[in-house]
Amino acid sequence: MFQDGASHEDIAQGALGDCYFLSALSVLGNERTVDLFECQQDSNHADETDPNHWKKTGCFMLKFHKAGEFQYIIVDDYIPYNNMGQPAFTKGGDDGLEMWPAILEKAYAKLYGSYTAIEAGKVHMALADMVDNGFPEQLALKTFMNNQKLFTSRLRNLDKVQALMGAGSPEHEMGDRAINEEGIVQGHAYAILDVDDYQGEQLLQLRNPHGKSAHTSEWNGDWADDSEKWTAKAKASLNYTPNDQVDGVFWMPNSDFLNNFKYIYICRELTVKAGWHCQSIDS
């Protein structure tokens, strides 16, 4: 199931149009992803209280939070394959040995009724289905087009509270077959892996859920993997090693992000520790 923990590097989109869901998986992180896998606790069936029970039987129980309520989904480890003998939908890892993305995708499809039912969606809503007390929010980036300073501040605050984020590029009549001149797939969901500042410039690290597949495209502007901006100091500061191979992961300035994306998808975890705050404006 998990060969080496859960990482965004394990996820590569297949023939299913669920880039939003896979982008959500990409930002969950190892701990949250592993926590989605449950074993059934039933005192009347001793074998089923064994955490390895579902591994032994080839079945898995997963916990979601649809509509604010826990929902448990049980699936087996059979996944659809295409006529080339490869997973038809999500592929896990370069060697295909990471099973967790395909199992989670299958469980999510069962949660909503079918694989077809989970085609096309929003990153923040998928995150809310997988995070305890998740509060989803969608922001239209045109709101910040004339106020980059406000966007920089908003993004910094979201990163500070460890909000989970994704992004959506503008729709296109060709769907995600269209790629703009800067290498951004159109009508496509991306994961926001990190937000950081370097020498006074705010940067975002994003991931195309196509991963290392043949359909992958990457940003080719400032801070792209082949950019001269990647000095030894920059690599160390941002903890990033540019990859000669297109793997879907890249950094870009927030100014270019505003010009190339249409929405930012946010899911914040509301906890008692964080507290509640109320603001009102008198009319």
Task: Name what the model sees in each region.
Residues 1-283:
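Accessory/interaction modules and long regulatory regions
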